[in-house]
Design a protein with these regions (language model features):
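Walker B catalytic acidic pair
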Residues: 296, 302-303, 314
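Residues immediately C-terminal
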Residues: 110, 299-300, 306-307
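Short beta-strand elements
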Residues: 18-24, 279, 383-386
């Protein structure tokens, strides 16, 4: 006897349809699984036998051959357990319904319970594209998958529930579509920040255009404090951004099962002890790293020179492309990483280099070695560099509150609305992602701005990349002012935001 049942596979974020073909024939009892499955797939035989025997179904006396098609694609993990069990139930006529429009996903325990499975939303989206109408999966994953429109999702707690459902004894109702809503959450407010007007303005520009930022200054000037308040001025996530981010967090097993859709932009603060694998992802089965977990949000690297230089160098390509590709023998996996990189650092090991209120105890060689841990190509990818000086006693002791995040966010939202209209019909989401081919069209300058940028290019020895990034930051400054064209003052602001590489790292970019 022959039967086939649909399932879904996953490698990285790449979901694909899998067909479990099963043949029950006469002969020496056996249970074989073919189709390029890994060790976890082969071990599923014991889980499946145990789960079925627990409800009085024995496969020990049968000769079963299961093929997971397509046979040339590597199958990794335990999520095929439920697919194979459904195929066994179908070939033994325990389930007699037409299953051609159904798909079954999930790991099954020895007791027959379905286990929470990561990466469900990616597989649910692909299942719909493949024409699947009904999706059966672990009950704990049902809410996550139900966000996909046009797909009936059935949460199954135990394989006996599946049998009773198709037998008509106890029908399972489809999971109601989950409609995510923007969460109201407590964030630290910019009004807590004393002084630092330039840094506040820099973060406003950065949040409006999704630009990368470097904060540099002596210890105790509030670099980390102000960075941690960035989430309070970031625009809400769109639905598409939310689904993208949820897919990554689902694979990483980081979703809240009660609120399985990420609706708040991530803020990932990474320790300087992080490895390259921890930062960009990796492993035998590639998992997303911190840069991908921060997708559509903020990646914060404090004490930047304390990171291993080789680790920082791995950021160069993903910062440029917005995607990280990890290659393994069984294939390549790509994870999106469209992030706002925020970094903070002291200007030297003791922290007082260039500080008029403190004495630097570092030698010139120590300072050069410290700053040299950040390569010029990495520095060139940071659009906005801002110095945070030590505060005066009057600034620290003042009871006056700074401008609240809500007022700053209001201006940022207006700038983002301008960008949305500008980028309508394209895949561009923010000024920082304008490709070179669109720069001339989307960043028009008046004559004064052109002349100033030309002068700066010659005097500062700017690279082509730095030129592009200055233009993008100037575009954001103009948007915040409501100007359609980039003016001289916008170029001036953007150039000033790149002046620290001359002060601390020598010649400009």
């Amino acid at each position: 006897m022959y039967s086939q049942v649909n399932g879904m596979g996953l490698f990285g974020m790449n979901a694909f349809k899998v067909t479990a073909e099963i043949m029950s024939s006469r002969g020496q009892p056996s249970f074989d699984i073919v189709g390029l499955g890994d060790l976890a797939v082969q071990e599923s035989k014991m889980r499946i036998k145990g789960a079925l025997s627990g409800i009085g179904i024995s496969v020990s006396g049968q000769r079963l051959t299961v093929n997971l098609a397509p046979a040339d694609v590597r199958k990794c993990g335990s999520l095929y357990d439920f697919t194979i069990i459904a195929a066994i139930l179908a070939v033994n006529n325990i389930i007699t319904d037409d299953l051609s429009g159904c798909a079954f996903i999930g790991e099954v325990s020895l007791g027959g319970s379905l286990v929470f499975t990561g990466g469900i939303i990616s597989m649910a989206i692909e299942a719909k594209k493949c024409g699947i109408k009904r999706l059966f999966l672990p009950a704990e994953n049902a809410k996550e998958a139900s966000v996909v429109e046009g797909l009936s999702v059935y949460g199954i707690s135990h394989i006996s529930d599946l049998i009773n459902h198709f037998a008509g004894k106890k029908r399972i109702s489809p999971e109601p579509p989950y409609v995510p809503s923007a969460e109201m959450f407590e964030t630290e407010d910019l009004s807590d920040v004393k002084g630092q007007a330039l840094a506040r303005h820099a973060l406003e520009v950065a949040a409006a255009g999704f630009h990368n930022v470097l904060l540099i200054g002596p210890p105790g000037t509030g670099k980390s404090m102000i960075a941690k308040r960035i989430p309070s001025i970031l625009p809400p996530m769109t639905f598409d951004e939310s689904i993208e981010t949820t897919g990554i967090h689902s694979i990483a097993g980081m979703l809240d099962r009660e609120k399985p859709i990420v609706t708040v932009r991530p803020f990932r603060s990474v320790s300087h002890t992080a490895s390259a694998v921890g930062l960009i992802g990796g492993g035998s089965i590639p998992r997303p790293g911190e840069i991908s977990l921060a997708h559509n949000g903020v990646l914060f690297l404090d004490e930047l020179p304390e990171f291993d230089r080789r680790t920082l160098e791995t950021l160069r390509q993903p910062l440029e492309d917005g995607v990280i590709t990890i290659s393994r023998a069984q294939g390549s996996v790509s994870y999106p990483c469209d992030i706002m990189l925020v970094t903070a650092m002291n200007p030297c090991p003791c922290g007082n280099f260039g500080n008029p209120k403190g004495k630097c105890t570092c030698s010139q060689n120590m300072i050069q070695n410290y700053l040299g841990k950040i390569s010029r190509p990495v520095l060139d990818r940071i659009d906005i560099q801002v110095e945070m000086p030590q505060l005066s006693y009057e600034e620290i002791s003042s009871a006056k509150k700074g401008e609240p995040s809500s007022a700053v966010l209001e201006r940022i939202m207006k700038a983002r609305e301008i960008q949305q209209k500008r980028f309508a019909g394209t895949e561009i989401r923010s000024n920082s992602k304008i490709p070179p081919s669109y720069l001339h069209e989307m960043c028009p300058m008046d004559e004064n701005a052109k002349q100033m940028l030309s002068d700066c290019f010659d005097k500062m020895g700017l690279s082509a990349r730095a030129y592009d990034r200055i233009l993008k930051v100037a575009r954001t400054c103009a948007d915040l002012s409501g100007s359609e064209v980039i003016r001289r003052q916008d170029i001036s602001s953007a150039v000033n935001f790149r002046s620290l590489d001359r002060k601390y790292w020598g010649a400009g970019k």
